[in-house]
């Protein structure tokens, strides 16, 4: 997993306007309950999702940026934060069992803080039954 600096650097290079928009959205406390990031592979969608996670959980925000060195940022970068739930395709698809896992996690309280964040990588690879299951609870 990448570091906070590389998340921000990647986003600044690939999606500078989007990064600026999300900095503003978060600073104004206008973050919606869900976002769908679509685009060509390599456009920075996973980096943006992880940057948002670090920005929301970071213990030491500096000029609107996560510091990348606090325990929260490091665990997010390593994929080990208990309040960040990530689902990705198993093989070529995201299956209904993975969405059931998300639903079960969604119903639980945050482990360490007052919020949880869910990231679905490559959501377009959901089976039809997985997508229908997801739509029933979001």
Where are these regions (language model features)?
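Clamp-loader machinery-focused feature within the broader ASCE/P-loop NTPase space
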Residues: 2-136
């Amino acid at each position: 997993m990448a570091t906070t600096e590389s998340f921000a650097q990647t986003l600044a290079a690939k999606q500078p306007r989007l990064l600026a928009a999300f900095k503003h959205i978060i600073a104004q406390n206008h973050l919606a309950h869900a976002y769908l990031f679509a685009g060509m592979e390599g456009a920075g969608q996973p980096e943006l999702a992880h940057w948002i996670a670090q920005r929301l959980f970071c213990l030491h925000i500096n000029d609107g940026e996560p510091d990348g060195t606090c325990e929260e940022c490091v665990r997010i970068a390593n994929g080990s934060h208990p309040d960040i739930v990530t689902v990705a395709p198993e093989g070529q698809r995201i299956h209904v069992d993975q969405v059931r896992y998300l639903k079960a996690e969604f119903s639980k309280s945050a482990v360490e803080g007052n919020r949880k964040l869910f990231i679905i990588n490559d959501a377009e690879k959901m089976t039809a039954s997985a997508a229908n299951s997801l739509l029933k609870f979001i």
